[in-house]
Amino acid sequence: MATELVLLSDVEVTADRIVRAAADAHPEGTYVSYRGGDIGQLVDVDANPVLTIFASRPVAHPREAAAAVVDPPASFALWTEVNIPSGDPTPGRGIAEAIAAAVGGVIKERV
């Protein structure tokens, strides 16, 4: 079963930021984007997906967004969905945390 996470931040998660953050956390991987950049995926050397990142979206209803995650931060402007495919979530979680750190955000579990 996939692990569904959310990256909450005030800075947009872009392909450039993902690639820079992943270079340290997942140096042997490759970043691939789909649908004009709306979906990004980090894959391992065998092209197996490790982490999928969807385009950041502005938070229109902060209270509702905060209620959808475990232990939300006090404020955030952007919501970025992150999925780790089935299997060991450890590598994907580490990369997600590195991306969050690169944009000054946090990774949270969905409720």
Task: Label each residue range with its predicted role.
Residues M1-V111:
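Acidic (Asp/Glu-rich) sequence patches and key acidic residues
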